[in-house]
């Protein structure tokens, strides 16, 4: 009898809110689809969760963030969106930029020249107007609702 090893997909995301009470969103084209999500990504083996978020910030923004505090951890079973045989574990931290933003912030979603895998753009959205429907991924939808309710 062959026993399949459990598969977990650990994702770490940053909740970055500016002084105008706007939340930073990432619009990405990945795996041949458009998605709006919070900045962040996958935990690598041997990496702590806060370290993962700092690494993802350098990869996505090209600048450092400070991880402030824990916001939310997925506490129910959720299959991974893209890898249904894996269980998702999503962890969200509040974070802030160490220096003023040096990358382009757009005023419209999916502000890149073509729908090619790997393209990403960023925009601010008023926290009070944030809706679960703004987000693509199920757990991001839960977190968006929590953020809106706290506005």
Predicted regions and their residues:
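N-terminal strand-loop-strand
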Residues: 1-38, 97
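Acidic/histidine-enriched, glycine/proline-rich intrinsically disordered or flexible terminal extensions
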Residues: 142-151
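Short, charged/polar surface micro-motifs in flexible loops or helix N-caps
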Residues: 17-22, 31-32, 44-45, 73-78, ...
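The catalytic Nudix box helix
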Residues: 38-72
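Active-site-adjacent beta-strand/loop module that shapes the phosphate/pyrophosphate-binding cleft
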Residues: 78-107, 146
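NUDIX/MutT-family hydrolases
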Residues: 104-142
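A generic structural micro-feature
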Residues: 4-8, 35, 83-89, 114-119
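Conserved hydrophobic/aromatic beta-strand scaffold that supports enzyme active sites
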Residues: 15, 92-94, 124
